[in-house]
Amino acid sequence: MDIVVNPEETKKVKYTWAYPRFEYNMTYYQVYNNAGSGYFTLMENPSSFDISMTYRFLSGDGSTGYKADYTGMALAYREHLIDEGILTEKTESDGDIPMRVDFVMSDVKKSVVGTEQVVTTDVDGVREILEDLSAQGINNVNSGLIGWQKKAETLAKPYAYKFSSKIGRKGEFEELFTDFAAKGTDISYSRDFVTINKKMISFYTNAAKHVNTWYLMTDKSVLYPANCPIFETGYALPSKTAEWIRKLSGKVSDYSESFTITGASNILTSTYDRNGVVSSLTDAEELIRNAVAAAGENMKINLVNPNQYLWEYTDRYLQAPVGTSQYVFETDSVPFLQMVLHGTMEVYGPYSNFSFYTDSDILRMIDYNISPSFIFTKEPSYLLADTVSSDMYSTEYEQYRNLAKKVYDGVNSVLSQIRGYEWTGREVPESGVIVNTYVKNGAKAQVIINYTDSDVNCLGTVTKALSASVVK
């Protein structure tokens, strides 16, 4: 489905309208030889699906119904999703907000013969860092482990449950999980179940194909370093993705309280063969939904930027967007998604150690009501320079130890005061000043966020420059 908006930028029309556009057929490039020669043609059989649309009309200033602006739209959409059973309101406990701490444990690079697994955080390193965070007063933590397995994320089969002694044996991982679970810290395995490569697994029975029957491939040679073991990636068959999620989650559910899924959370692909469609997007959605639902029966589910059809099963929304797409010029960015999801799941921002840690960024987390997240390694991040994880260019915990405390305390000092409140409104009384309104059991709390370089007097309270305050 496309959203078509008029007028276009070249037309001087004084009103705007938008409407959905559903595409039952499309042109594609049909290849007929190995050289890539081909022609454009239509799909032989159009797609088959039912169309259903729900319209909610908003008007006025909110005195009767939802306000006719983005806050009213977000709240109306949230109400619709709750009515449909896609979102469920959850009781949020008082106290400190959570923080997400992920770890890059290893990855692989080319060696003189074959490949070499580069270890940046072993089991003891994870334990040491989490204990240090606790010693600093950061106790409400949940964590995901990336590259925990033998051959790491890059070369291990998506369902593989094998360990490397350099990182930690199975028993050491189980002990790590159970020890910290007793302290209230949830540690999970993280895995991408969609992105595959030919050194990881056979494409013949595992990779998705384009409608022209060529494998769906992405050339990443301009992104990956020269010594990286792979340069092309493909996409797993939806049926395989679902199978692998079930298989790996079933192996770890005995001692892990949650499971972190990447790739499958926000990538949805169809697949074809010479006879036509094998799995449509609708089929793929159903396969992955059922697999994630099954995994969530015994564990919490942590999803990276998940698509809406998975929100029903999402306990933690990771890497939530906090800016615009920058495809068009816009006057402002607003927390539409965050208002929709508020009170139904935990929502975390981008990794703060990748330039999301300034005073303005801390205020953005408060404004958007999202919890901070970091990704760490015990060893210096330059060890990952020749791996697929080379984009994790600044992760060494020792460099971010004090910053993690500053960011967490800055966000927690405000958001901990409104835990369990319902987010009901957002106003901009003047440029650079935001007032978010929350309600709990009839009591109102307002959070003033001052992005400006000057003190601001608002709601009878002086909020200092680049800071936030709570008025109850």
Show where each model-derived region lies.
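Carbohydrate-recognition beta-sandwich/jelly-roll modules
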Residues: M1-E116, R127-Q136, N140
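Active-site-proximal substrate-binding groove within the catalytic cores of carbohydrate-active enzymes
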Residues: D2-Y19, F193-S256, S265-K472
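Generic alpha-helical structural element
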Residues: G62, Y66, T115-V118, D122, ...
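An active-site-proximal structural segment forming one wall of the substrate-binding cleft
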Residues: D69-L81, D122-D132, G234-T260
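Short secondary-structure junctions and interdomain/linker hinges
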Residues: E84-T88, N140, I187, P372-S373, ...
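Aromatic-lined carbohydrate-binding/catalytic grooves of carbohydrate-active enzymes
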Residues: E92-D179, K183-K240
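A structural motif corresponding to the C-terminal end of an alpha-helix
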Residues: D132-I138, F173-I187, K247-E257, N290-I301
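Conserved beta-strand positions
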Residues: S143-L145, Y189, I261-A264, L303
